[in-house]
């Protein structure tokens, strides 16, 4: 059945297809349609897992970027995910980069996007999170507005942290999108140190204010040198971050040279990222020595490579591009088998 749906949406522009899918899932979020979708999907329960002090119904999650504004939380939830990461969201709504900005690499099962954090702003997202009936864990992925300077960047993250804290199962600090100018600079040196220090200080204040501890993860890029990765791991440990998501999209085109759309600028996700993200997880796991849990993301399209990420050191997994190419059966297969 999904093959038929996929055939239809693949005739559309990639972003229009995405928006259409979100509208379908939003419709499926309606209590009238939920039982129908549930009976069609037959989502398995999976294996509960506690990571970052949070109880996840199962270790399979939806990666950020799929539901930027939290418009289809209950629809995605019906597919069987143990957790959903919504966002990336910024303090103020922004349009993102010029269209077209999403491109399929069908033969490689990849996607290139240069969206640029297009979203309706944190307040809009929080309303959707508050209204969701989904019983799994909701992570909120936060970023900075394009017009905010690097020097003022941490203020945007603190602003979003304040708004999201009371409504999130966990919060992700996204400093690794390649589509916001200079954003990845926040992963390095004094910027990184300063950002994490500010975030941890604010987390302590909010934990006291709301009388609950909400863990904070950092999402990193796959395009790191050995020394950069070591430095990032050291900084994460030093600031006692609660988790790390490895990885975001890649700017490399090594695996897709010569393919249609490969020349498009932006971050490449899907199968071409599979090996690279697993290698980063492996190296990160060696550096972190179990002190900080890893959430694995990047090119998961089946049980075998999902298992490879677990063996490399990931405790939770996230999918997005694989869902586009393989449909709900991918989620079902992973939830049924991954512990």
From Swiss-Prot:
Any Gene Ontology CC annotation: cytoplasm
Organism the protein comes from: Haemophilus influenzae (strain 86-028NP)
Listed name of the protein: Dihydroorotate dehydrogenase (quinone)
GN (gene name): pyrD
UniProt cross-references to Gene3D superfamilies, sorted A to Z: Aldolase class I
Pfam families (alphabetical): DHO_dh
Quaternary data: Monomer.
Catalytic activity, reaction form: (S)-dihydroorotate + a quinone = orotate + a quinol
Pathway(s) the chain acts in: Pyrimidine metabolism; UMP biosynthesis via de novo pathway; orotate from (S)-dihydroorotate (quinone route): step 1/1
